[in-house]
A protein has these predicted regions:
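Short clusters of hydrophobic/aromatic residues that line enzyme substrate/ligand-binding pockets
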Residues: 33, 102, 161
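Anion-binding (especially nucleotide phosphate/pyrophosphate-binding) glycine-rich loop
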Residues: 38-136
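Short linear Ser/Thr-Pro motifs
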Residues: 11, 104-106, 146
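ATP-dependent small-molecule kinase catalytic core of the GHMP/sugar-kinase superfamily
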Residues: 2-4, 9, 16-22, 27-30, ...
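Generic N-terminal targeting/processing segments that precede catalytic cores or assembly contacts
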Residues: 1-63
Length: 196
């Protein structure tokens, strides 16, 4: 059994500048400052005793052919990794999984890719996970989103992330123990019950 744990994130500045149309057209590109939270998306991948695919999330699906899955992120992650039969996949979130503004869909995608690659015996870099998640969400599924969520989920930590026509650059921000302590004491995340 493979278990993946992927963080969600908050942004301190630069939201919207990670969208390709902005980042590639501005002379300096886009930039966000992102902080991975201690809230996660958990993904498990386990071998089944038959060739069916079973996916458990807020719903449950069991199919003979992965192409018949309604969960498009799971379906496309399976297609990209080549793990297409004989598996049981479960996703569990520490937070509501849609509309929170914390990048949870991208964390699901990164977590799925990480778990499926490892299930297939491959270790991939954080950069590859982020790029593959972008390919699924933006290129294949046509989501009108930027790239910060995938990179924040794949790299974790506190980062300055730059986006431009030539790609993405991640710069980890080194925070003092005092600053980390203060952030933990002063930042409060509240679920209002509303989705965006």
């Amino acid at each position: 059994m493979i278990i993946s744990r992927t963080p969600v994130r908050v942004s301190f500045c630069g939201g919207g500048t990670d969208v390709d149309s902005f980042a590639s057209s501005e002379p300096n590109g886009g930039m966000v400052t992102s902080l991975a939270l201690n809230r996660h998306i958990h993904v498990t991948v386990n071998r089944r005793f038959d060739d069916k695919v079973r996916v458990s999330y807020s719903s449950m699906e069991t199919v003979d052919d992965f192409e018949d899955l309604n969960h498009e992120l799971v379906r496309e992650a399976m297609r990209l990794t080549g793990v297409t039969s004989g598996v049981e996949i479960t996703t569990i979130a520490d937070i509501p999984s849609r509309g929170t503004g914390l990048g949870s869909s991208s964390a699901v995608t990164v977590g799925l890719l990480n778990a499926l690659h490892r299930f297939a015996g491959r270790e991939v870099s954080a950069e590859q996970l982020a790029e593959e998640a972008c390919r699924i969400e933006i290129d294949v599924l046509g989501q009108p989103i930027g790239r910060q969520d995938q990179y924040a989920a794949a790299f974790g930590g506190v980062n300055s992330i730059r986006f431009g026509a030539d790609g993405v650059d991640i710069e980890p921000l080194r925070l003092s123990a005092y600053t980390v302590k203060r952030l933990g004491e002063e930042l409060t995340l509240v679920f209002t019950g509303l989705s965006r």
